[in-house]
C-alpha cells in the first residue's frame, strides 16, 4: 500500500519524464493484465478446494479420532482457564493410582523372569541407599537456600516401599 502511494507521488512529480513513465506503465499493464486476470483468483480457488477437501476428510475420520480431538481442545481450554499447575495436580491425582498399579504389575512380570529376582536383590539395596542420599542432598540444599533445589523432586521412598510391600 505504501509503495503504491510512493509510486503515485513520484509519478505526479516526474515532470518532463511523465510521458515516458506513462508509456512504460501502459506497456507493463498490457503484458501483466492478462496474466493477472487469469491467476488473481487462484489463491481463493485453492482455499475453496482445501475447504472442500477438509469437509470430505471430516466425513471419513473415525468418531474416536474426533472424540480425542475434542478432548484435547477441552484440556487446552482447561489449562488456559485454571492454569498449568492446577491441571497438573488434577492429572497427577487422577492417574497416580493407575501408574502405581502398572508399576506393580510390571514388577510382578519381571520377577517371573529367570535371574531377575537375584539381580533385583543385589541392586535394590544400593538403589535405595543412593535414593536416600539424593533426598538428603535435596533437603539440605533447600535448607541452605539454594533455589535449584525447589525444582528438583524428592523420591517418595516410603510410598514406593509401601506400594511394593503390599503386593
UniProtKB/Swiss-Prot annotation:
Pfam family, one: REF
Domain of life: Eukaryota
Induction: Regulated by heavy metal stress, wounding, and virus infection.
Protein role: Plays a role in plant defense.
Family as reported in the entry's similarity comment: Belongs to the REF/SRPP family.
Protein name: Stress-related protein
Amino acid at each position: 500500500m505504501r509503495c503504491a502511494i510512493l509510486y503515485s507521488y513520484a509519478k505526479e512529480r516526474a515532470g518532463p519524464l511523465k510521458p515516458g513513465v506513462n508509456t512504460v506503465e501502459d506497456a507493463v499493464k498490457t503484458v501483466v493484465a492478462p496474466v493477472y486476470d487469469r491467476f488473481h483468483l487462484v489463491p481463493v480457488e485453492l482455499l475453496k478446494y482445501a475447504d472442500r477437501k477438509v469437509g470430505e476428510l471430516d466425513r471419513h475420520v473415525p468418531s474416536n479420532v474426533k472424540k480425542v480431538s475434542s478432548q484435547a481442545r477441552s484440556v487446552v481450554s482447561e489449562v488456559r482457564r485454571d492454569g498449568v499447575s492446577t491441571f497438573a495436580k488434577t492429572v497427577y491425582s487422577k492417574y497416580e493410582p493407575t501408574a502405581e498399579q502398572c508399576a506393580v504389575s510390571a514388577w510382578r512380570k519381571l520377577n517371573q523372569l529367570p535371574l531377575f529376582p537375584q539381580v533385583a536383590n543385589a541392586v535394590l539395596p544400593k538403589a535405595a541407599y543412593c535414593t536416600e542420599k539424593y533426598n538428603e542432598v535435596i533437603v539440605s540444599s533447600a535448607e541452605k537456600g539454594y533455589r535449584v533445589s525447589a525444582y528438583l523432586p524428592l523420591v517418595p521412598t516410603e510410598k514406593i516401599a509401601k506400594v511394593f510391600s503390599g503386593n
